[in-house]
């Protein structure tokens, strides 16, 4: 009987499907896991099967460095593993290096950026406006606009191309902050839908598009 490392047993109790998987996507947190769910749903609609048919399970790595630990442990017991995460925490650089050395593929934002900041930085302006509308719908205009001194929704949406760069930074920073605009799986799924909607319009060299394509390529089409 094979005994799993203690570190992983809690995850297997909360997410037993991981035990039966062939491949694991270790997500930094709920936002990233929601994005992966949206991608799986999109693939289900597009080709007729999602990640589960391929034996791929995504897990919430619960932040800090735990998602790297999970990926390393699963890799050590024979699971092909991918990490999907921010790159705004230098405290986990050693864990990231260990994962890479273990042959784990890592889908990473630009250095210093969270997924929220990457989204607002890379997505077409129409997508930025959709993300803003969704945040207001979920949290209210007072929290999203007024408490941050943003003026008005109209001012943001109708801003000039020159000022849009500044708004992208402000919105990304606030979305990432303790206000946590998108920090649950449901919100992450909505972010994923927006990414999928606009990915073909993004510059081919932008990080968010590369992240999406890296995930799609890793998933592949194998259902054996």
Residue locations for each model-derived region?
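Acidic, Mg2+-coordinating catalytic modules of nucleic-acid enzymes
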Residues: 11-26, 30-224
């Amino acid at each position: 009987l094979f005994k799993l490392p203690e570190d992983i047993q809690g995850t297997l109790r909360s997410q037993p499907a991981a035990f039966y998987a062939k491949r694991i996507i270790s997500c930094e947190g709920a936002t990233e896991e929601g994005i992966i769910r949206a991608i799986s749903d999109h693939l289900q609609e597009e080709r007729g099967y999602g990640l589960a048919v391929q034996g791929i399970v995504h897990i919430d790595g619960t932040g800090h460095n735990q998602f790297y630990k999970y990926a390393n442990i699963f890799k050590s017991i024979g699971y092909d593993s991918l990490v999907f995460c921010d790159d705004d925490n230098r405290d986990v650089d050693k864990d990231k290096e260990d994962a890479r050395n273990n042959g784990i593929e890592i889908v990473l934002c630009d250095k210093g950026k969270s997924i929220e900041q990457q989204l607002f930085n890379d997505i077409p302006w129409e997508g930025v406006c959709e993300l803003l509308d969704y945040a207001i719908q979920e949290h209210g205009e007072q929290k999203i606009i007024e408490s941050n001194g943003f003026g008005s929704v109209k001012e943001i949406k109708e801003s000039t191309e020159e000022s849009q760069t500044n708004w992208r930074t402000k919105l990304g920073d606030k979305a990432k902050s303790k206000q946590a605009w998108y920090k649950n799986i449901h919100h992450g799924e909505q972010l994923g839908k927006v990414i999928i909607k606009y990915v073909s319009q993004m510059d081919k060299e932008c990080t968010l598009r590369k992240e999406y394509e890296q995930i799609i390529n890793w998933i592949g089409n194998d259902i054996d």
